[in-house]
């Protein structure tokens, strides 16, 4: 992780609805506990230009965290909308939430929230760092709203189109 690597984003047209269906299906196969995901308030089809592999990993990582940090019966709501040339995706869970003092750091490399009130969750603290890095490379933004004991909502905003070219990334 300390070495710099060259990446290339390969933009292509991505059907967000189909991608989300695939992510939910894959999570249901790999998850050790049952969960419910609602894909509501979404247009029939949202198309955006993105690197399909990285977008899959971004959304899968956030959904995986929502499941891990939501106790025995996770309920996750995913919504998406098109607005002013952007796509806004919200992933909301009914999990343990994130305390205010941690919100500014959860996207930092290797940052882990310590909480003695819950059993430890496996991880290295790089998932959300990767998520934020890749979203920024797509010229997008991510933010989180959270209340301890009530859950979290991750809000991703991505441009709907990009110039048709490969973009070099050094990270």
Regions found by a protein language model. Name each.
Residues 66-67:
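Short helix-loop "hinge" at the ATP-lid/N-box region of the Bergerat-fold HATPase_c
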Residues 73-85:
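Short beta-strand/loop element within the Bergerat-fold HATPase_c
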Residues 4-9, 45-50:
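Conserved micro-motifs of the catalytic ATP-binding
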Residues 98-110:
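Short conserved segment of the HATPase_c
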Residues 30-39:
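Short conserved segments within the C-terminal catalytic ATPase subdomain
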Residues 10-25:
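A conserved beta-strand-to-alpha-helix junction within the catalytic ATP-binding
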């Amino acid at each position: 992780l300390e070495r710099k690597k060259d990446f290339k984003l390969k933009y292509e047209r991505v059907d967000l609805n189909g991608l989300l269906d695939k992510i939910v299906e894959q999570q249901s196969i790999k998850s050790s506990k049952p969960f419910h995901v609602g894909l509501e308030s979404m247009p029939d089809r949202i198309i955006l230009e993105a690197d399909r592999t990285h977008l899959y990993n971004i959304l899968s990582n956030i959904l995986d965290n929502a499941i891990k940090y939501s106790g025995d019966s996770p309920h996750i709501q995913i919504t998406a909308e098109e607005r002013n040339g952007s796509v806004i995706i919200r992933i909301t869970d009914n999990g343990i939430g994130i305390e205010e003092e941690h919100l500014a750091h959860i996207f930092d490399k290797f940052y882990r929230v310590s909480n003695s009130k819950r059993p430890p969750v496996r991880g290295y603290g790089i998932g959300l760092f990767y998520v934020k890095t890749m979203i920024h490379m797509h010229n997008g933004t991510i933010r989180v709203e959270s209340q301890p004991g009530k859950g979290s909502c991750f809000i991703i905003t991505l441009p709907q189109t990009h110039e048709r070219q490969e973009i070099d990334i050094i990270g």
